[in-house]
């Protein structure tokens, strides 16, 4: 049953992706020859206007055919003959639909949440190294660590893990004022937890109630972080 749900989810993702191309093409006045869900032999098809709608045997792909492979097509409504901005919009529409799908799925997953951890310092553990007069203080909201933007609480540990050493340049908000701290020493320390030795950076973060606005914000930045991760993986 798990495989069936996985196939259906993948088919939905493809449908939304190709549907994004299709909708953008129609809105831009670009000719769509075929809109198909699936690959391989045709199971069902129907032509409406200039477009053939088809369901194919293998639910592992799809296509929105706009004459993009025919360089000899002289129709001004063919994809290759459309204005550059129209082609850009059509190409971007597929990815945009997948992003929106991910946003909706995450929002549904976050819906039951009662609260979220924020990037605001609440307190320090005994061995925390980054406090003091020139370091972090309880109530500080972290904005950036070594150039890495902090949107969610998890971004702090990600940014700290990226550091080549334990000294960080940090932008934060303290008492409503934006501050820049240089060379803040934050190194993981060993702590005893339930009889085991574990490493922590040594600070606690505050939580906030999961209001509708907070859920939307956390969902948005979760999607942004996925995009950021993909971009970084390509570097």
Feature-to-residue mapping (PLM):
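Residue-level signature of transmembrane alpha-helical entry/exit and packing/kink sites
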Residues: 2, 6, 82-91, 95
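Short N-terminal helix-initiation segments at or just after the protein's N-terminus
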Residues: 1-5, 114-117
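PDZ peptide-recognition modules
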Residues: 70-85, 97-235
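Alpha-helical transmembrane spans of integral membrane proteins, capturing the lipid-embedded, hydrophobic core
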Residues: 7-14, 91, 95, 99, ...
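Small-residue-rich helix-interface/hinge motifs
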Residues: 2-74
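Hydrophobic alpha-helical segments
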Residues: 8, 22, 91, 220-222
């Amino acid at each position: 049953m798990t495989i069936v749900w996985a196939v259906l989810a993948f088919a939905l993702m493809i449908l939304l992706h190709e549907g994004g191309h299709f909708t953008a093409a129609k809105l831009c006045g670009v000719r769509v020859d075929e809109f198909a869900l699936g690959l391989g032999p045709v199971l069902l098809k129907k032509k409406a206007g200039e477009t053939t709608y088809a369901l194919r045997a293998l639910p592992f792909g799809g296509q929105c055919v706009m004459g993009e492979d025919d360089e000899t097509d002289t129709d001004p409504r063919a994809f290759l003959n459309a204005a550059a901005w129209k082609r850009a919009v059509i190409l971007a529409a597929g990815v945009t639909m997948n992003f929106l799908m991910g946003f909706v799925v995450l929002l549904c997953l976050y819906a039951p949440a009662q609260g979220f951890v924020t990037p605001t310092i609440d307190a320090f553990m005994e061995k925390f190294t980054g406090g003091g007069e020139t370091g972090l203080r309880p109530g500080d909201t972290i904005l950036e660590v070594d150039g890495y933007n902090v949107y969610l609480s998890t971004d702090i540990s990600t940014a700290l893990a990226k550091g080549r050493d334990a000294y960080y340049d940090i932008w934060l908000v303290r008492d409503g004022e934006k501050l820049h701290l240089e060379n803040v020493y934050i190194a993981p320390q060993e702590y005893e937890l339930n009889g085991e030795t574990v490493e922590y950076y040594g600070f606690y973060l505050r939580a906030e109630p999961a209001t509708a606005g907070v859920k939307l914000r956390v969902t948005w930045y979760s999607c942004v972080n996925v995009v950021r991760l993909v971009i970084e993986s390509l570097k």
